[in-house]
């Protein structure tokens, strides 16, 4: 039976220490080799935490597979806008201002892992994350942009 280890790692910066080392040690895998492979596969997500799943396909031969997920929407938005974090009190402070093109770009990246059926729905979902992070879109409240998209005033 295949065993899996799921963890979040910073892109390109996984180490043999916790959480990976202790989780893989009992499975008999070469931890250094696995970490090297994880870092290679996650280097494009430098500075972001990404979900990684290591699945031991064959315990006897120590064959394994590494699956790298897509970072959380909030991490993609922070990287896209070059901000450290969202606003603590979104009604009082604005963490950043994104363009609609940036929001659509994040939606395209995340679409495969979302429940959204099309780009419009995915964009609305990313705008929802903007609401909670205190990020305006083209200088407007993201709720207003969502309303405009739903009303057909803005087409995606």
From Swiss-Prot:
Region feature (Disordered): 1-20
InterPro entries to which the protein is assigned, alphabetical: Ribosomal_uL11, Ribosomal_uL11_C, Ribosomal_uL11_C_sf, Ribosomal_uL11_N, Ribosomal_uL11_N_sf
Keyword terms of this UniProt record: Ribonucleoprotein, Ribosomal protein, RNA-binding, rRNA-binding
GO terms under biological process: translation
Pfam families found in the cross-reference section: Ribosomal_L11, Ribosomal_L11_N
Gene3D superfamilies named in the record: Ribosomal protein L11, C-terminal domain, Ribosomal protein L11/L12, N-terminal domain
A single Gene Ontology CC term: large ribosomal subunit
CDD domains named among the record's database cross-references: Ribosomal_L11
GO molecular function, one term: large ribosomal subunit rRNA binding
Domain of life: Archaea
General function of this protein: Forms part of the ribosomal stalk which helps the ribosome interact with GTP-bound translation factors.
Subunit (UniProt): Part of the ribosomal stalk of the 50S ribosomal subunit. Interacts with L10 and the large rRNA to form the base of the stalk. L10 forms an elongated spine to which L12 dimers bind in a sequential fashion forming a multimeric L10(L12)X complex.
Family membership: Belongs to the universal ribosomal protein uL11 family.
HAMAP family in UniProt: Ribosomal_uL11
Protein name: Large ribosomal subunit protein uL11
Protein source organism: Thermoplasma acidophilum (strain ATCC 25905 / DSM 1728 / JCM 9062 / NBRC 15155 / AMRC-C165)
């Amino acid at each position: 039976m295949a065993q899996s280890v799921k963890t979040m790692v910073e892109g390109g910066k996984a180490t043999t220490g916790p959480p990976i080392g202790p989780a893989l040690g009992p499975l008999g895998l070469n931890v250094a080799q696995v970490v090297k492979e994880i870092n290679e596969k996650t280097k494009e997500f430098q500075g972001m935490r990404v979900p990684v799943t290591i699945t031991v396909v064959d315990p006897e031969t120590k064959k394994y597979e590494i699956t790298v997920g897509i970072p959380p929407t909030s991490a993609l938005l922070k990287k896209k806008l070059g901000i450290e974090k969202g606003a603590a009190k979104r009604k009082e402070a604005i963490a950043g201002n994104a363009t609609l093109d940036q929001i659509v770009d994040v939606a395209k990246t995340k679409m495969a892992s979302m429940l959204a059926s099309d780009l419009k729905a995915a964009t609305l979902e990313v705008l929802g994350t903007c609401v909670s992070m205190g990020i305006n879109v083209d200088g407007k409240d993201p709720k207003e942009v969502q309303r405009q998209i739903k009303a057909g005033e803005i087409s995606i």
